[in-house]
A protein has these predicted regions:
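N-terminal Rossmann-like FAD-binding beta1-loop-alpha1 element of flavoenzymes
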Residues: 5-31
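Active-site-proximal beta-strand/loop segments in catalytic clefts of secreted hydrolases
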Residues: 11, 32-35, 80, 92
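A short, basic/flexible loop-to-alpha-helix module at the beginning of a structural domain
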Residues: 1-3
Length: 146
């Protein structure tokens, strides 16, 4: 039986980036992913995933808890079931919240590390954005975005 230093549950962007860092530091890593291999060409096309929503082998749908602010309605929540995670089924969209979103987190938690000035540095380390440089985007990280 093979023994691993770390087991990561979820083969999405976060899991695979973390695995890469651990491997570069000499650790052995096992990634466990519920879904299929990311080999469908529609997953690599902007909006190509839309036809696959109905009965997709790459998505699992859950119901939210009843939402009092919405008349106790429940909503479908799609969860990726594919190696690559939500990044494989999100229409190739990448975005961050606006700075005030993160400042709300600071107000809620009292922890400045959740603020924009702190988190934008993390985003920059993760991004490999060759189109938009500047002070708010990174261009040497493991996640290719544009």
């Amino acid at each position: 039986m093979k023994i691993f230093d770390f087991i990561i549950v979820g083969g999405g962007t976060s899991g695979t980036v973390k695995a890469e860092k651990l491997i570069k530091n000499g650790h052995t890593v096992l990634i466990i992913e519920e879904g299929k291999k990311n080999s469908n060409p529609f997953l690599s096309m902007p909006a190509g995933w839309i036809p696959m929503l109905e009965g997709s082998p790459y998505l699992k749908f859950y119901k939210s808890s009843p939402q009092p602010q919405l008349g106790n309605r429940q909503h479908d929540i799609a969860q990726a079931k594919v190696f690559g995670g939500g990044s494989s089924v999100n229409g190739m969209v990448y975005m961050r919240g606006k700075p005030s979103d993160y400042e709300n987190w600071v107000r809620e938690t009292g922890d400045e590390r959740w603020g924009w000035d702190s988190l934008v540095q993390n985003y920059k380390q993760l991004e490999n954005n060759q189109r938009l440089g500047g002070e708010f985007h990174g261009n040497e990280g493991p996640i290719k975005v544009s």
